[in-house]
Amino acid sequence: LEGGAFRNKIINNDTTGEKILVSFYRSPRYYYTKDSVSFDNDNETYFGSDSTWIVRYKKKSVLPNKMKTWELIVTDTGSSRAFWRKSFYKDGVGFSIATQTDTLSQPSTFIRSFFESFVPADTLKGVNPFEKKSHLFFADFLSNDSVLHKRAVKHINDIDLDSSDLSQLKTVIEWMNWKEKKYLDTKASLINKLGDIKTKPSADYLKQLYYALDDTVQLQYNALESLLQHKTQYAYNVFRDIINTEPPVLINSIGDYADYRYYSPLLAASGSGFDNGKFLDELSDSLKLTRTILPALLPLLNLEDYKSAIMKLLGEMVDSNLVKPKDYEMYFGKLMIEAKQELKKQSIAEKKKAIEKAEVDKEEKKVSVYSYYDDADKDTGNDDLSLYATLLLPYWETNTTVSPLIQQMLKSNDKVLKYNTMLLLLKHNKPFPDSLLTFFGSLDEYRYSLYTDLKQLKVSDRFPALYNNHLDLGKSSLLSKKTYGKPDSVVYVDRLITEYKGKKGFIYFYKYKAKKDDLTWKLATVGLVPEDPKQFEYEDSTTYSISPFDTAPFSSYTYNKYSFTEFSDTKLKEDEAVVDQLKKRLRKILYSRRKSAANFYDEDSDKASPSDYMD
């Protein structure tokens, strides 16, 4: 239990079918938090941060043994059902009991007696989460007791350190040697902790480490990554001095620019750091700071290791209006000639693909659309070419070679490249044929993307009027939910009026077949669509807290609570009226959004989890 624990058990009443969820929680040995108020709030709002909960009862008290208790009963609008929870906490050890009841009747004897008599045993000793654990951690790490040392190594990432711990952290980093099992991983984890200590002495020590580790390039990456995680001008200046004179050789794809914020929007929203050893992606976290050291970064365009990452970083700055053409004009010629070469490669690849497709069609060996979503024919775009376009576009007025090059990209047979180039021109108010908007509006796989992109750019009036209707946009938005395995057929069935969370509109129903030879149709839905034919969707960005036991950056996510657009596995029956089946499906998807016991409990095990949609 030294590493922390969370356990669940469901107590069943076989006679009444009632269930009570019993949970146990123990803080890890090195857990530390400064915010006791936030801790209390977590226990008082266990069922999430959703403001639509109706609190029927709330009580906080302290038992004679100094164990804190919280009791909470909440309900939802339009429902007589309620959740009843009671929590207990003392020195890093917590218990909770939770159940579902009905406000129309009194709790049963089973439920009432359990809640009234449940008292956790206080024999299990925990740790005070409000006391710093750094001294305990360092003592364990340097201990001759292998059990204590291994425990500390295992939980390096859990320990919370600040500037007062810098001296001890330096001691353990320098104390380590190759006799340590998993030496590189352990030392890397310790160096990563320096990224949490955002002081000048810490930055100076990271610089010292960088040069001392010149024979272990992987650890040099960690030193640079931690340095950039400080997000201070001093640290960035130290990084500039290093990268300008002694840039490390990049191996093992370390130079591949992988912005983790793209893959994990939760991390981006939280502002949390992310240790992956790829220090270059840290530069995009604070573009304004990166702009101050840009002159030292641009020469790296001449190094193959760094070229791609620096180009993408420069592209982000161009998009953010942080750089002007004059800031990198000395590299214009290099970018232009490389872009022309890339365009030639794109043209050759497109011709080759067209020939291969013709041969496949001739031999009737086309890949199954169900399995691969037309992977044999699907356009993939050209990220490199799009990036060159972004970097060269600022020279549109001053250099006559830019416009013809980008116009050639618009003529590409690759629809992804064509679409991205069109959006780039649209974003920067550059001319392009209006026929392109009609072309992409006519395509099911692009129509909804075009609609949302134009809306985001605040030029919705340029969306083709011919396709600005619920049915065409509905089919396209539905298909956008399929990243692969495109259905063979999607056919509109009917629509039903409904109301959800104060918004009234339609749920559109479609039937689809995954494969042409499927015997039955399945149902899909699109909505909630406003009644106004000129509007297609309600905007919303609800933030949902997952659980009080989850820590940032994974404690919440954002979604549109008015979106019911999805493919279902519900089959359309031939022996039942279609409208009745649609009404039944509508009730099901609306009920699925309720905070119901069906989602709160996992019937097949002793585990429990909150609903995926608790709004």
Predicted features by range, described:
Residues 19-24, 92-102:
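Short, well-ordered beta-strand elements
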Residues 377-402, 407-615:
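Intrinsically disordered terminal tails
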Residues 129-139, 162-178, 199-211, 233-246, ...:
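Amphipathic alpha-helical scaffolding segments comprising HEAT/armadillo-like alpha-solenoid repeats
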Residues 1, 47-48, 97-138, 575-606, ...:
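Surface-exposed amphipathic alpha-helical segments
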Residues 1-89, 191-193, 204, 222, ...:
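Signature of long, low-cysteine stretches enriched in small and polar/charged residues
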Residues 15, 35-36, 50-51, 77, ...:
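Coil residues (strongly favoring Ser/Thr
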Residues 150-162, 184-199, 218-232, 251-287, ...:
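Structural detector for internal amphipathic alpha-helices that build alpha-solenoid repeat scaffolds
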Residues 135-168, 612-615:
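Acidic, Ser/Thr-rich low-complexity intrinsically disordered segments
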